[in-house]
Amino acid sequence: MFILSGFADEISPSLDEQLAVLGAESISHLELRSVWGTNVADLDDMQIASLRRALGETGVHVSAIGSPIGKIRVDAPLPPELERMRRVADIARELGTAIVRVFSFFIPPGEPPERHRQRVIDRMGALAQLAEERGLILAHENEKEIYGDIPQRCADLITAVGSLALRATFDAANFVQCGVQPHAEGYGLLRPYLVYLQIKDALAATGEVVPAGQGDGQLRETLTALADSGFEGYLSLEPHLAQAGRYGGFSGPEGFHRAAQALRSLLDDTAARWR
């Protein structure tokens, strides 16, 4: 069964508005990337306590921490990133989730990713070891311009690190924007490692982000295959319909509603079970 979630900061910086829209959409989970205009990794203890109270009052749960870990250059110092990871791990524990989204480091422009393979593996291995110690699962997202931006390098990274604490999340739109056919070229390679999906779609011709099922992301095929295989996990809406950037995106309440409608329609068409 699929469980719907979403990046609530795509709705508004305001927690109250985020929770109101999620309630109106009957979405019971959120992926925490930022709130009150502050990135999740930078929230202080008082903010986390306030957030936890509000979630408890509304019955909304945290599906994952949409962290920025690994969204730095591969040659940037690692110790500060490990310290941020420790803080994110504390926040994940406080908010009751074991899943943390991560990235595999930006490659310097013009350089072949393979040149940095071992450094990426070593760095991701250090993050995975920390995750193992904290009982977390790192869900690696296939972001553009990082080492793991195409299916082959995503699979290579996960197998090379060799930790059950490092798994994959699947972002069809990002694959499209990297010139990949997500289902035809990516699903088979990554299915053994998939624990989570970021839901957005994109047009291959322009890279424009569109609602699920309205682009070239082959989401219908992927969702059908996952349902047929008995996948149990989250589908996290990340619409990017009003604004998309390297470190996040925005859709507004109306855009988020359009994205949620599109995903529900797609799920109904595939006869998948979801809630």
Residue spans for each PLM region:
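Histidine-acidic metal/acid-base catalytic patches
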Residues: M1-A8, S12-S28, G56-G59, G96, ...
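N-terminal small/glycine-rich loop or linker at the start of catalytic domains
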Residues: M1-S5, H61-I72, S104-I107
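Short beta-strand segments at enzyme active-site cores
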Residues: E31-L32, S63-G66, A98-S104, L136-E141, ...
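Alpha-helix N-cap and loop-to-helix initiation/capping positions
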Residues: D42-S50, A76-R84, E111-D122, E145, ...
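Catalytic-core regions built around general acid/base machinery
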Residues: Q47-E57, R123-L130, G186, E221-A225
